[in-house]
């Protein structure tokens, strides 16, 4: 495994396993399969409703807690100092741990400044090894990092070959925040898995288009957390460290960037209205 060093000196695996949209009843099996493959970084969230199943899997694995890099996220219905603080304790209870390796604010809506204050307190108390944000565009990230006492260590945002987040990466790097990808496969949109550029480059190394897309992100200094419920694909997604894309390969894949979300925009008033409706 390869690692990145966060702005507080904590080492984070470059490759992890995500459980977004994995039903709670399947999560334990999937996480145990991922651990068997070799994953040690596991990414969940309050809004995934499978934290308890992740905790069950980690406990059943028999491996010591310190073997894992465990991430979860505070959902917007728990925004604000008091609610966030209580929800973080509840997440730890579900995950069967007394500390988290990384805790993120899931969305830049609601009283996320209150949430971040609660996170800073728990960080100072040693309950959180690193804290950060998710889905924060460059403007929102710059705002919170300017006012935060503990600077965000990670920003997990939509990042894939069709949305390479070049502007966000520029500012995150400038201020020492690690970019992490959600949706590294774009959920297969724009026919990613049969894309001719990715397919042709992958064939040179005996790799799939999916593996090529992940390798591109790794070589672009992006942490990735691909999700699959199939163990054979978990293994494929893990086998990324035995080949290196050439500068020419990287340039060809960089040309795929459309610079726009394939899902939704946090700047769209309709998106904001939806988030406000659940607060």
How should these model regions be labeled?
Residues 1-68, 185, 279:
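N-terminal binding-site loop/beta-alpha segment at the start of enzyme catalytic domains
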Residues 1-4, 52-59, 88-90, 138-141, ...:
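Alpha-helical scaffolding within the catalytic cores
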Residues 7, 55-65, 89-96, 121-123, ...:
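Acidic (Asp/Glu)-rich catalytic clusters
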Residues 22-34, 80-95, 141, 163-164:
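Short, acidic/polar
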Residues 22-25, 43-53, 77-82, 108-113, ...:
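Acidic-and-aromatic substrate-binding clefts and catalytic sites of carbohydrate-active enzymes
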Residues 39, 97-100, 128, 152:
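A structural motif
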Residues 77-116, 120-121:
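Glycine/small-residue-rich loop that forms an oxyanion/phosphate-binding "nest" at active or ligand-binding sites
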Residues 107-279:
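Beta/alpha (TIM)-barrel catalytic core signal, keyed to glycine-rich beta->alpha loops juxtaposed to Asp/Glu
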């Amino acid at each position: 495994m390869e690692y990145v060093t966060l702005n507080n000196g904590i080492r984070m695996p470059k490759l992890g396993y995500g459980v977004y949209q994995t039903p709670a009843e399947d999560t334990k099996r999937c996480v145990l399969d991922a651990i068997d493959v070799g994953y040690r970084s596991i990414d969940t969230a309050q809004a995934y409703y499978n934290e308890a199943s992740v905790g069950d899997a980690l406990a059943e694995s028999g491996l010591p807690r310190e073997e894992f890099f465990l991430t979860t996220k505070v959902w917007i219905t728990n925004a604000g100092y008091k609610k966030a603080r209580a929800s973080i304790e509840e997440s730890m209870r579900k995950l069967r741990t007394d500390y988290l390796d990384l805790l993120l604010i899931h969305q830049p809506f609601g009283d996320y400044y209150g949430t971040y204050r609660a996170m800073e307190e728990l960080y100072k108390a040693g309950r959180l090894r690193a804290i950060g944000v998710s889905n924060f565009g460059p403007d929102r990230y710059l705002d919170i990092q300017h006012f935060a006492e503990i600077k965000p260590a990670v920003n997990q945002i939509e990042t894939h070959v069709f949305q390479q987040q070049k502007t966000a990466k520029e500012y995150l790097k400038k201020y020492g925040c690690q970019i992490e990808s959600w949706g590294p496969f774009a959920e297969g949109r724009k026919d990613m898995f049969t894309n001719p550029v990715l397919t042709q480059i992958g064939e040179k190394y005996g790799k799939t288009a999916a593996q090529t897309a992940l390798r591109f992100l790794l070589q672009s200094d992006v942490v990735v957390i691909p999700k699959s419920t199939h163990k054979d694909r978990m293994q494929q997604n893990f086998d990324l460290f035995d080949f290196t894309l050439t500068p020419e390969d990287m340039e060809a894949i960089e040309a795929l960037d459309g610079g726009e979300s394939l899902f939704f925009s946090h700047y769209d008033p309709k998106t904001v209205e939806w988030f406000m409706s659940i607060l």
